[in-house]
Amino acid sequence: MQTSSSGYILALDLGTTGNRAFIFNNAGKIVAQAYKELTQHYPQPGWLEHDAEEIWQDTCWVMKTAIANAQISPSEIAAIGLTVQRETCLLWDKTTGKPLHKAIVWQDRRTAPLCHQLQEKGYAQEIYSRTGLVVDAYFSATKLRWLLDYITGVDLKNVLAGTIDTWILWKLTGGKVHATDHSNASRTMLMNLKTGEWDEQLLEILQIPAHILPQIQPSLGKFGLTDTSLLDTAIPITAILGDQQAALFGHGCDRPGLMKCTYGTGSFLVAHTGSNIVRSQHQLISTIAWTQYNSQENINIGYALEGSMFTSGACIQWLRDGIKLIKTAAETETMANQVDDNGGVYFVPAFSGLGAPYWDMNARGAFFGITASVQPQHLVRAVLEAIAYQVLEVVQAINASCSSPMQRLIVDGGACENNFLMQFQADVLGIPVERPTMRDTTVQGAAFAAGLAVGFWDSYTALVNQRQIDRIFEPGEGSQNAIYNFATWQKAVKRSLDWV
């Protein structure tokens, strides 16, 4: 597995709710880590912003803290891998290095009216054909258009644009490298899925100047060196992946028939489709899994089908911080088990509209079926059940789009800690749910990719074969009721559509 007898890999995971750094040793094990929670800015209902300067400062802090915790020298780090929240984007001044506005987050819905305009003008099919994506405020393109409209009196020759990976790479390299990888670029609604390049026609439709966009490079490759002023040494940055693609890589899902679901702020079910673009008739999106050079220095492209569900872990966070029904996320498991059923209550997790398979920017969240006998436990259980029902809908869509049905679901992310949720997920799917011992698969994927790209490890298969399974949840006695109630949940969803 290893070609390096000593040294370490630094992996950065810059997510929606926080930023993390991990140090991996040559055995592929985590030896140290650091975390910083990220401030969420809600300037208006349906809007969500992040301070890009805060992300950069936190990145510096978690890197230095993780290195200190590992008690190693930065010069011992062989490479850096970077994985990020996708679609979130910003503009910055390349002279001052300062953002021109806060970054607009993937959950932000402010550009829904612009998306409706694109649909009304008949661009939806053209955009899907070229990018594999549906027209939605989720993706970066309309966010960038909004930012360009918002900033006035700025010389565009001085402006750079990018997703979070591009911003952090530019800062890490001291402003020397303005680049992104195919997995992140494929989420902008501006990259041609077949060519792997920015699509000139889409840039024209959205009036986005090509010169402000980063160069697109393979996910595993050479992204430059860290500026020596940062860690007193120049460290190669050798992998960049979107967070869901990094998890796919970390699980070893590198060929058709393998898929995973990450339960984070949202739930994201991704199935590798090999070197072929698979088009779904069921509102799933086609995207890049990851890219890398082969031995002939040609680019190998791996594609994927994805079902993006915008709100899952965010529901649990809302139960805690929004309506203060719980004090900790862990309480939800205990509370859900305190009642025999959902008490007739169904929850629709549409805080930011609905993603796959509905793609309704105007849907909103709701509880249905509340009576005077309903207890807090029923509400909590309804929220957990809704997370699982969303995944069921996407699994059904993937099964209908692929030649053979899914045999098992591999899971990761914070909410997969919840045993009630995982058992209910197995019950509704009717297939085993496999939870690995290593929960941080996203950052593991970034580390593996960076190490393989620099020759720190020589075998992807050997790394993946180290995976250990914590628990397999088999469909149980609750399956019949769970499946029966699914139809009622779907009825609740239909009543939430096109709400605003």
From Swiss-Prot:
Broadest EC class assigned to this enzyme: transferase
Chain positions recorded as glycerol binding sites: R86, E87, Y138, D243, Q244
Binding, sn-glycerol 3-phosphate: T16, R86, E87, Y138, D243
Transmembrane segments: none
GO molecular function: ATP binding; glycerol kinase activity
Binding-site positions, ADP: T16, R20, T265, G313, G414, N418
Keyword Oxidoreductase (UniProt): no
Activity control summary: Inhibited by fructose 1,6-bisphosphate (FBP).
GO terms of biological process kind: glycerol catabolic process; glycerol metabolic process; glycerol-3-phosphate metabolic process
Pathway: Polyol metabolism; glycerol degradation via glycerol kinase pathway; sn-glycerol 3-phosphate from glycerol: step 1/1
InterPro entries per record: ATPase_NBD, Carb_kinase_FGGY, Carb_kinase_FGGY_CS, FGGY_C, FGGY_N, Glycerol_kin
Keyword terms, alphabetized: ATP-binding, Glycerol metabolism, Kinase, Nucleotide-binding, Transferase
Listed EC numbers: 2.7.1.30
PROSITE patterns linked to this entry: FGGY_KINASES_2
UniProt: ATP binding residues: T16, T17, T265, G313, Q317, G414
Protein origin, superkingdom: Bacteria
One Gene Ontology CC term in the entry: cytosol
PANTHER family: GLYCEROL KINASE, SUGAR KINASE
NCBIfam families: glycerol_kin (TIGR01311), PRK00047.1 (NF000756)
Free-text function comment from the UniProt entry: Key enzyme in the regulation of glycerol uptake and metabolism. Catalyzes the phosphorylation of glycerol to yield sn-glycerol 3-phosphate.
Family per record: Belongs to the FGGY kinase family.
Protein name according to UniProt: Glycerol kinase
Native organism: Trichormus variabilis (strain ATCC 29413 / PCC 7937) (Anabaena variabilis)
Lineage: Bacteria, Bacillati, Cyanobacteriota, Cyanophyceae, Nostocales
Gene behind the chain: glpK
